[in-house]
Amino acid sequence: MTSTDPSQASADRYVVIGNPVAHSRSPSIHAAFARQTGEAVHYDRLEAPLDGFADTVRRFFADGGYGCNVTVPFKLEAYDLADRLTERAEAAGAVNTLWIEEGLIHGDNTDGIGLVRDIQDNLDTLIEGKRVLLLGAGGAAMGAMLPLIECRPSRIVVANRTASRASDMLEAFVEAADQYGVELWGGGLDALEGLSEDEAVDVVINASSSSLQGEVPPVPEFLLGEGVLAYDMMYGAEPTVFLQFAARCGARVSDGLGMLVEQAAEAFYIWRGVRPRTAPVLAELRAALQAERKV
């Protein structure tokens, strides 16, 4: 376990659990939140064995831990482990935030709300009334759907390599979409070629694994033109290949670093009841990434 602030021996203990987890930026983010708010928080990394996630979590709480963030590959296991789930977690089918309340393990998913706050607050792009294209139908896309719907876009199009998976995912959100007046459409990535320019979108979100594989999703160039925000949930020292392609097409681009900070801020608020300011923390992280890029 790696400590972010060894001087805080009496602080409330939190961790991020994953495998691997040494690369996680969560400790530095939460340490910044703690300094900013004056909260006595001690946040570490904790690597769980691939076959020992539940035992690791239970031991952490039994030893006096207050809460934990969950990263790959354990978000589905965290969903199963939680005794109580928030509406967001149930909709996402995955959990990235755990805490103990009245002796029970509670689970939430803050990824989607982190995404929409980054887009709306940090990137100054209102989602209400807009047309959104979501690339991918895996766990990242599932976690984004309900928070996106709650922002009341006019339409959400989900495009996935396997068309049936996109359709299946949308089935789970028909009721919510009806409640918020959002039109849903889903299909294969190849179906995007059949869209007319009248069906152009305002925001394109890459929630697929393509950037991890160094691949560009087959998105028609006219969907990434001037005035469009192209957003990739991935982030790194260099722009992803998707963002490079989108920028060449004329779109405004952003990676997912702000989403990382915003989902962490939501977890901090759940645990502490205090909402930290994210802008200075995001600026600090962005500067660190730029420094890495120059090395």
From Swiss-Prot:
It catalyses: shikimate + NADP(+) = 3-dehydroshikimate + NADPH + H(+). NADP(+) binds at E87, G136, A137, G138, G139, A140, N160, R161, T162, A163, S164, R165, M233, G256. The gene is aroE. CDD domains: NAD_bind_Shikimate_DH. This is Shikimate dehydrogenase (NADP(+)). GO terms for cellular component: cytosol. InterPro entries: Aminoacid_DH-like_N_sf, NAD(P)-bd_dom_sf, SDH_C, Shikimate_DH, Shikimate_DH-bd_N, Shikimate_DH_fam, Shikm_DH/Glu-tRNA_Rdtase. Belongs to the shikimate dehydrogenase family. The active site is at K75. GO terms for biological process: amino acid biosynthetic process; aromatic amino acid family biosynthetic process; chorismate biosynthetic process; shikimate metabolic process. Shikimate binds at S24, R25, S26, T71, N96, D111, Y235. Pathway: Metabolic intermediate biosynthesis; chorismate biosynthesis; chorismate from D-erythrose 4-phosphate and phosphoenolpyruvate: step 4/7. Its EC number is 1.1.1.25. Homodimer. It is an enzyme of class 1 (oxidoreductase). Transmembrane segments: none annotated. GO terms for molecular function: NADP binding; shikimate 3-dehydrogenase (NADP+) activity. Keywords: Amino-acid biosynthesis, Aromatic amino acid biosynthesis, NADP, Oxidoreductase. Pfam families: SDH_C (PF18317), Shikimate_DH (PF01488), Shikimate_dh_N (PF08501). It comes from Cupriavidus taiwanensis (strain DSM 17343 / BCRC 17206 / CCUG 44338 / CIP 107171 / LMG 19424 / R1) (Ralstonia taiwanensis (strain LMG 19424)). Involved in the biosynthesis of the chorismate, which leads to the biosynthesis of aromatic amino acids. Catalyzes the reversible NADPH linked reduction of 3-dehydroshikimate (DHSA) to yield shikimate (SA).
